[in-house]
Design a protein with these regions (language model features):
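Short beta-strand or tight-loop elements
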Residues: 89, 102, 173-175, 246
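C-terminal helical "tail/cap" subdomain of flavin- and related membrane-associated enzymes
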Residues: 44, 257, 278-280, 294-387
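Acidic/histidine metal-binding catalytic segments
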Residues: 29-30, 86, 227-244, 302-307, ...
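Conserved FAD/dinucleotide-binding core of flavoprotein oxidoreductases
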Residues: 46-71, 109-117, 157-244
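Conserved N-terminal helical subregion
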Residues: 10-155, 205-207, 214-219, 364-387
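Conserved mid-domain beta->alpha element of the FAD-binding
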Residues: 124-125, 152, 179, 220-221, ...
Length: 387
């Protein structure tokens, strides 16, 4: 079943999906191309705005999608191409055994609670931020890192703001809203709108809730945003109209020295869980998979391919994890808060245009989706290439 709310797929990852035959005709069923990315101050005035995807001259769009619907689309594509037995639902990895260096064994618990073991040539751990594969590979890793930000997420049906598909960040580092549509407007002009409400608190006492993700009630957090009321947006009313709300802390893990242990590798959140400030966690997971594929073609199905993947991505993406801790592209709101408390009349007198453009350009380059670099890049995997 479809779970989750919204996420963004950056042009570098959309390029890879298109190459796999998962193009606009399919992605339009689970989301829509992003037209604009905008930051606004606490008083609702524009700090920075830019077109995104093909609207900005990229050869590929940026997509805002419903996370659960994207999962279902990818699941259906795998089943159609690889057969009904290709995916075992309800199972989770418990760990692995490398006593035979040429044939690792993955230990799995199935949905009915039984434990099974599978021999394999390569094992790719894509089991998320609580990865059992990573825990075994790096038993001395630091605990989950929480920097003090708490997020509440939800959806509602409403008219899009600013444009038919604008990604909006509003407020300050201490209190902010992220709002964007994840469906095209219906006959009444209403889209499914994804919203994220965030506050930053003192994290010295650690996360005190029993779970990392829970359903919550409006009264537990809406008071933080009572003054987010503008002539173009009434945030308190928007929150009251939401279908549901979920709470989770903004968490990641400290980077690790390697994502690979011989024939075993990590990818996605198992390798590099990162703050969602750059909207590129899902995109990087897609890139991981494609780089692994490219290395398998170059080196064959064996540890050399995984070593090549690790050599190409581990260090730069580890740096991106740390960069996202400083708020990623939302770091402009940090500057704004430091210089004027988030309230201004003329943004040019607070953060000049050249400073804003330079800040954003550095982040895009670090995240791998700077426009000219991406548009000129050769295909990750050549058409027709096989292992």
């Amino acid at each position: 079943r479809s779970l989750g709310v919204g996420l963004n797929i950056q042009p570098n990852a959309v390029r890879e999906l298109f190459a796999l035959g998962i193009a606009a005709d399919l992605l339009d069923q689970v989301g829509l191309p992003v037209q604009e990315w905008a930051l606004l101050g606490l008083n609702g005035k524009e700090v920075y705005a830019e077109p995104r995807g093909t609207f900005a001259g990229y050869n590929w769009p940026q997509y805002a999608v419903h996370r659960g619907n994207l999962h279902m689309l990818l699941y259906q594509q795998v089943i159609e191409r690889m057969g009904p037995d290709a995916v075992k639902l309800g199972a989770r990895a418990l760990g692995y055994d490398r006593s035979n260096p040429k044939q690792p064994v993955c230990h799995v618990q199935t949905g009915d609670g039984q434990e099974q073991s599978y021999k394999c040539t390569l094992l790719i751990g894509a089991d998320g931020i609580h990865s059992a594969i990573r825990s075994q590979m790096h038993p001395d890793q630091a605990p989950i890192h929480w920097g003090g930000a708490i997020m509440w997420r939800g959806t509602l049906r409403a008219k899009p703001m600013r444009s038919p598909s604008s990604f909006i960040g509003l407020g300050t580092h201490q209190r902010r809203m992220v709002i964007y549509p994840i469906s095209k407007p219906d006959d009444q002009g209403l889209s499914l709108i994804n919203w994220i409400a965030e506050v930053t608190v003192d994290s010295s006492g650690g996360w005190q809730q029993d779970s990392w993700f829970r359903e919550t009630k409006l009264h537990e957090f809406a008071h933080h945003f009572e003054d987010f009321n503008y002539d173009w947006l009434d945030v308190p009313a928007m929150l009251k109209a939401a279908d549901c709300a979920y709470e989770n802390p903004m968490i990641d893990r400290d980077p690790i020295s390697s994502w690979v242990d011989g024939p075993v590798a990590l990818m996605g959140d198992a390798a590099h869980p990162m703050y969602p400030t750059g909207s590129n966690g899902a995109s990087q997971a897609i890139m991981d998979a494609r780089i692994i594929g490219a290395k398998l073609i170059a080196h064959g199905i064996g540890p050399r391919a995984l070593s090549g993947y690790n050599a190409e991505l581990c260090e730069p993406i580890s740096q991106l994890v740390l960069r996202n801790r400083s708020a990623g592209p939302f770091g402009l709101l940090n500057l704004l808060h430091d210089r004027c408390g988030g309230v201004f009349d003329d943004i040019e007198t607070v953060i000049p245009a050249q400073e804003r453009d330079t800040f954003m350009g550095k982040y895009k380059q670090a995240a791998g989706f700077a426009k000219d670099m991406l548009n000129a890049a050769p295909a990750t995997i050549a058409v027709g290439a096989t292992v």
